[in-house]
Regions:
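Conserved beta-hairpin
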Residues: 71-90
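Conserved acetyl-CoA-binding loop-helix of GNAT-fold acetyltransferases
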Residues: 138-141, 146-162
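Short coil/turn motifs at secondary-structure junctions
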Residues: 92-94, 144
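Intrinsic low-complexity, intrinsically disordered segments enriched in polar/basic residues
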Residues: 88-91, 108, 153
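C-terminal helical "lid" subdomain and adjoining coupling/linker elements of P-loop NTPases
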Residues: 59-72
Length: 211
């Protein structure tokens, strides 16, 4: 049956980690434009392969969003032609003051804006939905290159880009564990909210942090 292999190839079901030919050296951080996925298909497969290896929720829907969803920002790190890190951010906020008040009052839930809406609705901070921000959707580092500060460097570069773009903050939502909380705090993020109940999908409390 040729259909199943075709679908697997089309949706990158069988993508694995990029091969780490050399592990000595310094990773170079670079931005990725959505158009690069078409001009450099190997970059797409390596980027998606890193995400799949690190995030069990990564799905074909994420692949679709990588290709054509608006408001996405991508960056990566590379050493000796091996992709060592991948970072995916989503634009949030920028709502009108009127809509932000509706979110704060619980009457409106516009699509997206996970952290911005949560801070407005649950933390009593409607201004969070007005401010312009970017949320870390996915971040992954190749296992052969971990504990070298690559994730921290990717985030630091995006902080600088956000400042240059006039954004107000970066954010992240994650299932709380002491290790993950420490990772985000070491990157400069400050914890701003923890849910009162554990998530069924992860068994962890949902935490939110901003930079």
């Amino acid at each position: 049956d040729t259909l199943e292999p075709f679908i697997s190839e089309l949706l990158l079901f069988d993508e694995h980690l990029p091969v780490a030919e050399q592990t000595d050296g310094t990773s170079e951080i670079f931005p990725i434009d959505a158009a690069d996925w078409l001009s450099e298909p190997a970059l797409l497969t390596d980027f998606y392969g890193l995400l799949t290896s690190a995030h069990y929720r990564t799905s074909p829907l994420d692949l679709r969003r990588l290709l054509d969803a608006p408001g996405m920002t991508f960056s990566a790190s590379r050493m000796h032609n091996t992709l060592t890190g991948a970072l995916w951010l989503v634009d949030e906020g920028g709502l009108s003051a009127e809509l932000a008040q509706e979110v704060w009052a619980g009457r409106r839930r516009p699509r997206g804006n996970l952290v911005a809406q949560s801070l407005a609705a649950h933390a009593g901070f409607p201004e969070a939905a007005v401010l312009r921000s970017r949320r870390v959707s996915r971040i992954a580092v190749h296992p052969a290159f971990r504990r070298r500060g690559i994730a921290r460097d990717l985030l630091a570069a995006q902080k600088q880009c956000a400042q240059q773009a006039g954004l107000d903050f970066l954010s992240v939502s994650f299932g709380y564990t002491s290790d993950l909380a420490s990772l985000w705090q070491q990157a400069g993020f400050r914890l701003v909210r923890i849910s009162t109940q554990k998530e069924a999908s992860s068994g962890c409390y949902a935490a939110m942090a901003i930079l």
